[in-house]
């Protein structure tokens, strides 16, 4: 079933705010994708090739996951608004924050190791 046929249309302000939030997730995903590609292509002396490629792959995979998460979150919020339900709570933000923290620690370790 198409989302536009579900329930009744929410106030446009809320629907557009939901869309802006989705686009923010996409921008963030594109940033991680650019970081992964940049690390692989523009930093050949950063750590060992295996570690550099593994970290670049991790950043690119995280980018794809964020893009999908952004869409699924948009969809859940849109359904909830159309059905006049409470917006769903998510624990995923904690998981995303922890993954980002791990990547940051790895990068800091590699920078200190390479320097």
Swiss-Prot record:
Topology in membrane: Multi-pass membrane protein
Residues in the Cytoplasmic compartment per record: 1-30, 75-92
GO biological process, one term: response to oxidative stress
Principal place of residence: membrane
Annotated localization: Cell inner membrane
Transmembrane regions listed in the UniProt entry: 31-51, 54-74, 93-113
Cellular component GO terms, alphabetical: plasma membrane
Pfam families reported for this sequence: DUF202
Protein name: Inner membrane protein YidH
Species for this entry: Escherichia coli (strain K12)
């Amino acid at each position: 079933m198409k989302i536009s046929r579900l329930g009744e249309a929410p106030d446009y302000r809320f629907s557009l705010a939901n869309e802006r939030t989705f686009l923010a997730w996409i921008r963030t995903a594109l940033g991680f994708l650019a970081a992964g590609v940049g690390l692989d292509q523009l930093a050949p002396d950063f750590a060992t090739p295996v570690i550099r490629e593994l970290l670049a792959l991790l950043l690119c995979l995280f980018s794809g996951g964020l893009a999908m998460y952004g869409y699924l979150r948009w969809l859940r919020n849109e359904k909830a608004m159309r059905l006049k339900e409470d917006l769903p709570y998510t624990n995923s933000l904690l998981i995303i924050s922890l993954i980002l923290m791990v990547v940051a620690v790895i990068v800091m370790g590699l920078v200190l190791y390479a320097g």
